[in-house]
Amino acid sequence: RKASETTKEKFAPIREWEEKGLLTVIDGPTIDPKTVVGWFVEQREKYGITKIVADNFRMDLLRPLFLEEGFEIEVIRNPTAADNLLAPRIEDAFANNHIIFGDNPLMRWYTNNVLVKTNGDGNKSYKKKEEVRRKTDGFKAFEYCLWRADEIIDYDYDDAFDMLDEIEF
């Protein structure tokens, strides 16, 4: 092999992921806050999202728009502390195969871009392996969902189907 082949960094296949509908490429220096909120409104229709949990990044711009659309907002003020608090839940979920990304290479890419740092006290934080090309936004969104995962109602569909079976039409 040539030296350049072994050291060449692989770029994420962004266009391929866009064609699969896993992401949308925005032509501009930043994403318009209305576009972000509009995406969440669409997801609310599919998944019943009512609450947005996020760190402080851009929330000064996004908060009024989210509130206007009827979302509840919770801001994680110390993301590093949140990393440490959620680390056991995240580690357990991955270790016990409770996380299934399905056929979504984008989420695997986000997760594989994360570097777990453990300080001298044993506290863990989730950092980027490399600052420029290694995006972790999807992993952080996943992590922040776990911040309030205990608020999600676990519904027993078997009971509902049993009840429907008892109804005579």
Give, region by region, the residue ranges found by the protein language model:
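Short, surface-exposed amphipathic charged segments that create phosphate/polyanion-binding patches used
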Residues: A87-N96
